[in-house]
UniProtKB/Swiss-Prot annotation:
The active site is at D19. Belongs to the 4-hydroxybenzoyl-CoA thioesterase family. DHNA-CoA hydrolase subfamily. This is 1,4-dihydroxy-2-naphthoyl-CoA hydrolase. InterPro entries: DHNA_CoA_hydrolase (IPR022829), HotDog_dom_sf (IPR029069). Catalyzes the hydrolysis of 1,4-dihydroxy-2-naphthoyl-CoA (DHNA-CoA) to 1,4-dihydroxy-2-naphthoate (DHNA), a reaction involved in phylloquinone (vitamin K1) biosynthesis. Pfam families: 4HBT_2. GO terms for biological process: phylloquinone biosynthetic process. Signal peptide: none annotated. Keywords: Hydrolase. Coiled coil: none annotated.
Length: 150
């Protein structure tokens, strides 16, 4: 599997993504950043239930809430724009990981998102080691890619 398969995604900006001025509503950038890393782990081959807890079962005893997020808009993103979304995950420490997301239109960086997650035990809410599947995804994303952050 080539990193491009799970680290570069596409998204077309839809009418419902935009405000009355015809540009994306600010909250959508962070939503897209999160959806992109979810899609990335799916393409990589990690089942969602291995990362995201299921309220009906305690199969996954770890949760990964967002503890920090940022969005930077560098150029207007409008209805109909086709964006390339480049994902750069990295491990911060044993219980924190960060996903940097770059949104490009015609190879020009138009926005950036950053989301930091903390790995916690679902019951105690104490910090725990990142799930092995996430560790492998982060490692594979960083070792096998020839991409450079924008």
């Amino acid at each position: 599997m080539k990193p491009k398969n799970w680290l570069i995604l596409k998204r077309k900006v839809r009418f419902g993504d935009c405000d009355s001025a015809g540009v994306i509503h600010f909250h959508n950038l962070l939503r897209w950043a999160h959806e992109s890393w979810e899609e990335s782990i799916d393409i990589y081959g990690i089942p969602h239930q291995d990362i995201f807890p299921d309220s009906n079962s305690h199969k996954n005893q770890i949760i990964c809430p967002i503890v920090n997020c940022e969005a930077n808009f560098l150029s207007p993103i409008k209805i109909g724009d086709l964006l390339s979304i480049k994902i750069f995950p990295k491990k911060i420490n044993n219980h924190l990981f960060q996903v940097n997301t770059f949104f490009l239109k015609d190879e020009i960086n138009v926005a950036e998102g950053k989301i930091i997650h903390c790995s916690l035990d679902v019951d105690s809410k104490l910090k725990v080691k990142l799930p092995d599947q996430l560790e492998r995804w982060i490692e594979a994303s960083n070792i096998n890619t020839n991409l450079k952050e924008c």
